[in-house]
Amino acid sequence: MIFIDNRQNKFDVTEELTKKLEEVISFVLKEEKVKEDCEVSLVFVDNEEIRGINNETRGIDKTTDVLSFPMIDYPEDKVYKDVYLEHEFDKCYFDGDELILGDIVLSLERTKEQSIEFNHSFEREACYLVTHSVLHLLGYDHMEEEEKARMRGREEELLGKLNITRES
């Protein structure tokens, strides 16, 4: 289940946008071989709120585009499909029958700024950031160059399969 919570009032959150982002989340989960019913929360905020969350949770007093809060601890250099296709999850990761993957906090204000900066659509930028964040919920990271290359490659592959291009 995908929960969407709009906590900002600077941008209209259309049904078209929420459906597209739900489609992106579902597609990434399917492509990453997530078989369980799962729970992902997507929270829309403005720059001020994401800056506060970034400072509170990471000690970085700076606006960012998206924050990911995975609920599952993955072994180092492993992602969901590397580990959990053959193993079961501990019950603490479930809410009833749903696997709790985590939360995505997306600044729609920063998304708009970046879409202008990178010269593509707001929808494309939002889809990219949500794809990026879902991959974080599944254990991907970009702290080391090798991890970064793996994650960036996977992002582009997934967006390509969804036909979401820089021209979109």
Swiss-Prot record:
Q: Which GO terms describe its molecular function?
A: metalloendopeptidase activity; RNA endonuclease activity; zinc ion binding
Q: Where in the cell is it found?
A: Cytoplasm
Q: GO CC terms for this protein?
A: cytoplasm
PROSITE patterns hit by this protein: UPF0054
The EC number(s) attached to this protein equal: 3.1.-.-
Listed A to Z, the keywords are: Cytoplasm, Endonuclease, Hydrolase, Metal-binding, Nuclease, Ribosome biogenesis, rRNA processing, Zinc
Q: Which Pfam families match?
A: YbeY
**SUPFAM superfamilies assigned:** Metalloproteases ('zincins'), catalytic domain
GO process annotations (BP): rRNA processing
Q: Cofactors per UniProt?
A: Zn(2+)
Q: Where does Zn(2+) bind?
A: H132, H136, H142
Cite the cofactor comment. Answer: Binds 1 zinc ion.
Function field: Single strand-specific metallo-endoribonuclease involved in late-stage 70S ribosome quality control and in maturation of the 3' terminus of the 16S rRNA.
- Family statement: Belongs to the endoribonuclease YbeY family.
Please identify the protein, giving its name as recorded: Endoribonuclease YbeY
Q: Which organism is it from?
A: Clostridium perfringens (strain SM101 / Type A)
